[in-house]
Amino acid sequence: MKMKKIASVVSAGVMAMGIGASLAPASVAFADSPYCGTVEKAAPENGFFFDFAKKMPQETQASHGWCNVDMFDTIWYKDNVTFNSKRMQLHLDVEDGPGWSIPGINYSGAEFRTFNQNRYHYGLYEVCMKPAKSDGIVSSFFTYTGPYDEPKTQWDEIDIEFLGKDTAKVQFNYYVDSKGGHEYLYDLGFDASEDFHVYAFDWEPDAITWYVDGKEVHKAVGNLPVTPSMVMANLWAGKGVDEWLNPVDDSDFPVQAEYKWMKYTPSEKADK
């Protein structure tokens, strides 16, 4: 989700558009139910299935006490990641951290991520989610690796992003060695903030293919990410990107994005 340079924070004792179009459907196996019904599937070898009815998976964590610089008007706050009603909620609110304040940062958001040492490579990444709807914000599901997390690598990233200003569309994007500019907006034909749907991307050496409810909707080829990555989701408010997101309207805050499950099925070409 456009992970740029990270600014660590210590305060009050707390440490914190694309290539290609729709082609013939690829041969990939999706989780049951395009609308996020009960999915009883064990994680495949070297993959995972995170069922948020079962709270925070052991392989994951919530970011806390720091913020991304540049376009992020948000500090990550671990208590903004909650588990209720058999779902994970990521919350975004006017900054209300536990006694700390960061000059120039107005909002507290949420970020869910796998541990730094848990890296995932080629394969099918799926999420059952419902994004937040409000001007100036982003809800996401993505893979990321870069120079700001140990072990340090080049910045590679693959994104599924919902711009809160128009949740009838989803944005796909990717970065290769810090170079982005591959944004592609897909018109869903429905308001994603009103119900759960399955969004996915199949990452292979020669292509990234994005899906909505099992339907192929976009493909990128050419110079693509190659580096095993963490899996992440976040909800944040932007700044200085009004043309992209619209100005933040916090009159309806707090807002939340919800997730029922995430799944990764490794490709035969993935690093083990």
Question: Each PLM stretch: what is its role?
Answer:
Residues 1-10:
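Bacterial Sec-dependent N-terminal signal peptides
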Residues 9, 13-20:
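Hydrophobic h-region of N-terminal signal peptides that target proteins for export
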Residues 19-34:
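Sec-dependent signal peptide cleavage junction
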Residues 30-272:
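GH16 jelly-roll
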